[in-house]
From Swiss-Prot:
Membrane spanning stretches: none
Record protein name field: L-rhamnose-binding lectin CSL1
Domain of life: Eukaryota
Organism: Oncorhynchus keta (Chum salmon)
Keyword presence, Repeat: yes
Keywords: Hemagglutinin, Lectin, Repeat
Amino acid sequence: EIQRRFLTCGDPSLQCDYGVIMVYGVQFSTIELSSNERPKACSDTEAKNGPSNRCDGNEKCDVATSGSVCDLCNSAYLTNIFLDVTYGCLESKKVTTCEGVVHLECGDGVVFLQKALYGRIDSQTCSQGRPQSQLTNTKCSQEGTLALWSQRCDGKQTCEVNMRVNQISDPCVGTYKYLDVTYICLPAKTSITCEGSTSSLDCGKGVIKVFHANYGRRDGSTCSAGRHELSNQNCLQPKTLDVVKQWCEGKSQCTLGLDPVFGDPCFGTYKYLEVSYTCLGGSPTV
């Protein structure tokens, strides 16, 4: 369910009583004390994207933190700043396995990881049939688990998290560990564009909201016809999301030439651009 809230710098909070926040759109305006032109900072991308950057994936947040729109738009000519925020509360899904392998599925949506733990933080989970000596360490966690699997799963409709083949190291030798993953399913579409082509997103009368983007390769089947350079399936371009947001977010349509924009994050691998997005006020066409 999409909700709408008017925020001010004196009351900057968003909260979901259930689920987590996902900001879909932000508009802002000001009341001026004089006829002087509104400061240019009030139309800056950073000011507009602030609520989304601070709130997405959280149960509650304060928009007016350091560097927020309240700082960027502050001037002697303004008495107040109003943020018109459209957002939704998305239900979280939690899966726990003692085997170190979980399958994440989102049907028509796409996966967005919130939390991921590989280790042990209590003595009850996955304890059946295990000796007490394997359960006593409850401060055990594999560092980097969330970052690793966010890179590999975010933006996909389905994803397998397998710590058996992707474990960096053993965070606590002698402790019986489990895998605990919390994620949400974003109501998004996915655009795939193969290397050497031009990517176009079109929302008709709506505007583009980008959730995830990567230029590289995360599986062996996408854009694979007639290609042999597919063995590297962990090819990531970290700047992809920021670039796609800068070019496309808030527009009704946008076009990206892949090679000159993203460079070559993994030489010798045939790459593709994947973008998970939705259309606010319209239906996406690719």
